[in-house]
């Protein structure tokens, strides 16, 4: 099976793409990541994918024209059903739009925050990156509240800051690639999630996640620096860190990885064998 995905820099499509790449042998698939600027007809004609992932703005009459001579299925990331003759085999939508798909419930999935296991699995402890606390500003826009928290953290704890947004603090060490990010998380005792769902990657690496304005009861959540201080002092002193890390790690490997999302996708399009293959790959990684 040939599967094509656009190279859009959205965390969800990046996570799906990364995990699918690791499933090429397990699930007998070929994965192609195409430049989103390239005309859709060219992609369909050159690659001839069996399955293609498209965002709503990419799904247009080209699909109807291509379907006259090419045999393919597509999955649409969309906020509403598409008005095309060539219908998607499945939809993926955000929770806020799910009521728009009331007539498509059987083939509609919701976007769910997930750990990008394929990118972070090999994270290693690094002497250079060791810290009590790590913070990453990927996939969020830093505001006054975030900066206030970061300034407080850097005066109270051995903190290292990373990410594409430059921060005028000596503790800011710059942006990281996917491997450096995994190592930096693994080399800290605690990592702060400022609202970008990094808590799931953190939990998978068995590091303690602490989440700004989090709502999941299993995770350590805070809304103020005072609440954060109490949480950090307990975790740094190891009063509950090991038990906490084990519980959130189990939560992630039970249902919160992109391998689970891919299993759901294959299941909804009627491919139970590849669905199970995705879960088997996760089990293989976890057992290493």
Predicted regions and their residues:
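Structural motif
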Residues: 50-53, 73, 190
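Short boundary motifs at domain starts and secondary-structure transition points
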Residues: 1, 42-43, 120-128, 182
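Catalytic binding pocket for nucleotide-activated donors in carbohydrate/polymer assembly enzymes
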Residues: 3-33, 85, 161-273, 277-286
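Short amphipathic alpha-helix with an adjacent loop that forms part of the alpha/beta core around
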Residues: 40-46, 234-235
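Short, polar loop motifs at secondary-structure junctions
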Residues: 36-37, 56-60, 78-82, 93-100, ...
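A short, glycine/small-residue-rich beta-strand->loop->alpha-helix junction that serves as a flexible
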Residues: 7-15, 54, 140-144
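Catalytic core of nucleotide-activated saccharide and alditol-phosphate transferases
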Residues: 58-156, 256-257
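Short N-terminal targeting/anchoring amphipathic segment
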Residues: 44-58
């Amino acid at each position: 099976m040939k599967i094509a995905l656009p190279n859009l820099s959205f965390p969800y499509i990046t996570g799906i793409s990364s995990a699918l790449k690791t499933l090429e042998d397990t699930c007998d698939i070929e994965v192609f990541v195409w430049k989103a600027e390239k005309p859709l007809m060219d992609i369909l004609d050159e690659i001839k994918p069996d399955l293609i992932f498209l965002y709503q703005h990419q799904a247009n009459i080209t699909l109807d024209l291509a379907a006259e001579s090419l045999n393919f299925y597509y999955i649409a990331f969309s906020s509403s059903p598409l008005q095309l003759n060539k219908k998607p085999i499945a939809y993926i939508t955000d929770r806020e739009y799910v009521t728009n798909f009331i007539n498509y419930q059987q083939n509609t999935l919701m976007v769910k925050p997930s750990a990008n296991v394929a990118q972070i699995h090999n994270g290693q402890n690094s002497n250079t990156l060791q810290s009590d606390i790590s913070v990453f500003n990927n996939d969020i826009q830093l505001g006054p509240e975030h900066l206030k928290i970061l300034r407080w953290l850097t005066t109270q704890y051995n903190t290292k800051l990373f990410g594409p947004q430059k921060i005028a603090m000596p503790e800011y060490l710059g942006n990281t690639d996917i491997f450096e990010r995994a190592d930096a998380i693994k080399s800290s005792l605690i990592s702060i999630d400022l609202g970008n769902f990094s808590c799931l990657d953190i939990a998978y690496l068995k590091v303690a996640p602490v989440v700004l304005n989090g709502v999941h009861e299993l995770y350590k959540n805070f809304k103020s620096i005072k609440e954060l201080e109490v949480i950090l002092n307990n975790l740094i002193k190891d009063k509950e860190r090991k038990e906490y890390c084990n519980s959130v790690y189990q939560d992630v490997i039970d249902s919160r990885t992109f391998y689970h999302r891919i299993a759901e996708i294959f299941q909804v399009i009627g491919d139970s064998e590849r669905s199970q293959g995705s879960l088997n790959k996760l089990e293989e990684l976890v057992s290493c």
